[in-house]
């Protein structure tokens, strides 16, 4: 199984949880040091993991990753950039990087890995979006749009490949206590947590539990769905 963007935050917690449940995990990221540290953390708990360095902003790197990962039965499209810029302040360069990493990379990585899933007659894909895909986000509209694209991929891929035994779902987290989220959103991050029905932010492991469930046999009749793990933020 393959988890992209797994050297920190939600991706890292997801990889660790899969390993605790007995999976052999391939993790990706740009930082080789953090990759090695994540592998070591998994192995010290008795798990199995391999790190593949990949820059998902580079389509050639995406294709190399697919080749190196080999036969993948579970794919977690988690890697993302995180920027907070309102419309009048959004620059073209960071916009392009965001859509390359958040939209183009998961599309073509999934396309490269699907043939072996189809041949095997089974597979599970979980895309990680955001509650921002479902609500207006005035301080980060481009980020919200990129996440909405992932949710659209989920529905289209579920429709296209369900007959091949492949399930595709999305987890849409709410405000989650990762270093990148706290650094990017600052005071607004805590305010978002306070606005959820549960009145708090999430811990990465809480999001990871939902991801692992959707990839597991326990979710065998679940496909094409977006599961909001956002403390009820989008419920009202």
Protein language model features and the residues they cover:
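Conserved glycine-rich cofactor-binding loop
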Residues: 7-9, 31
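Short, small/polar-rich loop/turn modules that mediate ligand/substrate recognition or access, typified
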Residues: 76, 162, 167, 222-224
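Substrate-binding pocket helix/loop in short-chain dehydrogenase/reductase
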Residues: 86-87, 91-99, 181, 192
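C-terminal substrate-recognition "lid" of short-chain dehydrogenase/reductases
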Residues: 107, 114, 200-235
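Active-site helix of classical SDR
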Residues: 110, 146, 154
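Alpha-helical segment proximal to the catalytic Tyr-Lys
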Residues: 115, 159-163, 220
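Residue(s) in the substrate-gating loop at a strand-loop-helix junction
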Residues: 130
């Amino acid at each position: 199984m393959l988890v992209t963007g797994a050297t920190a935050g939600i991706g890292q917690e997801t990889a660790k949880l899969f390993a605790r449940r007995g999976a052999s995990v391939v993790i990706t990221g740009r930082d080789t040091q953090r990759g090695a540290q994540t592998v070591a953390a998994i192995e010290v708990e008795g798990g199995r993991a391999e790190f593949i360095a990949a820059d998902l902003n580079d389509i050639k790197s995406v294709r190399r990753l697919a080749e190196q990962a080999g036969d993948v039965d579970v794919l977690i499209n988690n890697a993302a950039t995180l920027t907070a810029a309102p419309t009048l302040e959004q620059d073209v360069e960071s916009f392009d990087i965001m859509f390359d990493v958040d939209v183009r990379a998961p599309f073509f990585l999934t396309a490269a890995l699907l043939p072996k899933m189809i041949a095997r007659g089974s597979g599970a894909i979980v895309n990680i979006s955001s509650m921002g895909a479902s609500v207006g986000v005035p301080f980060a509209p481009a980020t919200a749009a990129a996440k909405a694209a992932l949710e659209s991929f989920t529905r289209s891929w579920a429709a296209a490949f369900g007959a091949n035994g492949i399930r595709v779902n999305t987890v849409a987290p709410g405000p989650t206590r990762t270093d990148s989220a706290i650094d990017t959103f600052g005071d607004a991050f805590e305010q978002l947590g306070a606005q959820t029905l549960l009145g708090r932010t999430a811990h990465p492991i809480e999001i990871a539990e939902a991801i692992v469930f959707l990839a597991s046999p326990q979710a065998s009749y679940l496909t094409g769905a977006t599961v909001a793990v956002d403390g009820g933020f989008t419920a009202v």
